[in-house]
Swiss-Prot record:
Superkingdom of origin: Eukaryota
Organism: Fungal sp. (strain ATCC 74256)
Underlying gene: phiF
Pfam families in UniProt: Prp3_C (PF06544)
Entry protein name: Phomoidride biosynthesis cluster protein F
InterPro entries attached to this UniProt entry: Phi-like, Prp3_C, UBQ-conjugating_enzyme/RWD
Biotechnology: Phomoidrides A and B (also known as CP-225,917 and CP-263,114) are potent inhibitors of Ras farnesyltransferase and squalene synthase. CP-225,917 and CP-263,114 inhibit Ras farnesyl transferase from rat brain with IC(50) values of 6 uM and 20 uoM, respectively. CP-225,917 inhibits squalene synthase with an IC(50) value of 43 uM and CP-263,114 with an IC(50) of 160 uM.
Role: Part of the gene cluster that mediates the biosynthesis of the antihypercholesterolemic agents phomoidrides which are dimeric anhydrides. The function of phiF within the pathway has still to be determined. The pathway begins with the highly reducing polyketide synthase phiA that catalyzes the formation of a C12-fatty acyl-ACP, starting from one acetate and 5 malonate units. The hydrolase phiM is involved in the release of the C12-fatty acyl chain from phiA.
Length: 301
């Protein structure tokens, strides 16, 4: 089998077009663009090559990447990930195409926490990605559609406010049991994303792992869906097992936690590999916030 050819930079004319697109993007969104030091270096290498195309081995990356944060209103924003390609995507396919025509940018629209998944999927499917001005057209399209979506949500919320307060607005405390939750970054997401859903509680890693959430049923469901689909997207489905062990609801339920926090470091470790929280300390932690009676319900002890 013949060895695959190394990726080749785009033709000079196409690279100039991509450079202009990058400059336009930076000039139009100076405060909304996030770029890393490596992105700035990549742009500098591109400009150096365009100033002196005679370089035998240009130090061009495969692409230049940006994160674009678009404000819809003071409380809502969108995030787009944009890649401007600098190499030929497929040399063989490109032989019959216009060699000077640059590849279209790759635009990824990340689902914001305030938008439901179905709406996000519908918007992604209708993004004008095939246009030569796809970035600007996508920005305008998403701003317009998101503004309309938020207005619809606000109107629906006002109409259904009494019913929502009677059902979804009730505070509940839900206890989840996890076989294991050893990855620190995943636990950080559990803690850091909770305020977006007005949730309080705690997470305890190890075997067993315990997750306690205080908030409305709707917010807890949306939060758990977000954690599973985004934070845990790289985890095999059979390892995402999490079960609701106990739910406290009723007029008497009040928050006992002031925020969302991780308590793993506060519990001594036991077990053969030191990955199981000492149950005596866990029980005392429950009792310390007035929840000693639910200890057996949660852990089945």
């Amino acid at each position: 089998m013949a060895p695959s050819e190394a990726p080749q930079p785009l033709p000079l004319c196409a690279l100039e077009h991509q450079s202009l697109a990058i400059d336009l993007l930076l000039s139009m969104f100076p405060d909304e663009i996030e770029q890393t030091s490596s992105t700035a270096t990549s742009i500098e290498h591109l400009r150096q090559y365009l100033d002196d195309p005679s370089q035998a081995s240009p130090r061009l990356p495969h692409s230049v990447e940006f994160t674009l944060n678009l404000s819809i209103d003071p409380e809502h924003e969108l995030q787009l990930h944009i890649r401007i390609l600098l190499e030929q995507v497929n040399v063989d396919i490109g032989k019959d195409a216009d060699a000077d025509e640059p590849p279209l940018p790759v635009i990824t629209f990340r689902c914001p926490t305030w938008m439901n998944r179905k709406t996000h999927t519908d918007l992604v499917q209708r993004m004008p990605l095939d246009s030569p001005d796809s970035i600007l057209m996508t920005v305008e399209y998403l701003k317009e559609e998101s503004t309309e979506y938020l207005a619809t949500c606000a109107a629906s919320s006002a109409t259904n406010e009494p019913e929502a307060q009677a059902t979804s607005g009730k505070l509940v405390r839900v206890w989840f049991y996890l076989q294991s939750l050893s990855t620190r970054s995943k636990r950080n997401d559990i803690v850091n994303w909770a305020p977006n859903y007005d949730l309080t509680g705690f997470v305890l890693a190890g075997k067993p792992g315990i997750l306690c959430l205080e908030g409305t049923s709707d917010n807890i469901s949306a939060y758990m869906s977000d954690i599973k689909t985004r934070s845990w997207s790289d985890i095999p489905s059979h390892q995402k097992k999490i079960s609701e062990r106990y739910r406290e609801e009723g007029q008497h339920i009040e928050r006992v936690f002031q925020n969302m926090r991780e308590v793993t470091g506060e519990i001594s470790k036991g077990g053969h590999r030191g990955n199981r929280g000492e149950m005596g300390e866990v029980r005392r932690m429950f009792e310390g916030v007035g929840l000693g009676e639910v200890f057996a319900e949660v852990l089945g002890l």
